[in-house]
A protein has these predicted regions:
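Tryptophan-anchored aromatic micro-motifs
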Residues: 1-15, 89-91
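Beta-strand elements of well-folded, non-transmembrane domains
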Residues: 10-14, 56-58, 80-84, 95, ...
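N-terminal glycine/threonine-rich, aromatic-flanked beta-hairpin/loop signature
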Residues: 15-55, 95
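Hydrophobic/aromatic beta-strand elements that line small-molecule binding cavities or substrate pockets
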Residues: 21, 38-41, 74-82, 103-106
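Short acidic/polar mixed-charge low-complexity motifs
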Residues: 33-35, 74, 97-101
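Edge beta-strand at a domain terminus
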Residues: 42-44, 84-111
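A generic structural micro-feature
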Residues: 46, 68-72, 97
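An anionic, turn-rich surface loop/hairpin at beta-sheet edges
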Residues: 55-79
Length: 111
């Protein structure tokens, strides 16, 4: 994936959200309304994959994330397909092989 800032649609069987992600030197960091995603893209050319960790954060009564309310979730193993600055990352979690996750990412700016 090209280094930069991406507009991302995050989707699972249980949830869907819009967010942003940054990619730099293969490192992926993303956030939406309820989760933080971080990990690494691996491989070259058509053999690109990603391993991401996903953290769900709780919301305080104010609507702000509680720093100590982070809840760990399993690692995601994703295949990456991309054309013209758009990427689709899709796969499952280590804990639930039947679960499906999909991230549709569109490049918007340099870092």
């Amino acid at each position: 994936m090209r280094d930069g800032i991406y507009k991302v649609d995050f989707q699972s069987e249980k949830d869907a959200a819009k967010g942003i992600a940054m990619v730099r030197d293969g490192n992926f960091t993303g956030i939406d309304q309820t989760h933080v995603y971080f990990g690494k893209n691996e491989g070259q050319g058509g053999e690109l994959s990603a391993q991401l960790n996903m953290l769900m954060y709780a919301r305080a009564a104010t609507g702000m994330a509680e720093a100590l309310g982070m809840k760990s979730a399993p690692r995601l193993r994703l295949n990456v397909e991309g054309v013209d600055g758009r990427f689709v990352l899709s796969g499952a979690s280590d804990a639930e092989s039947r679960s499906r996750y999909e991230f549709k990412a569109e490049w918007v700016a340099e870092l």
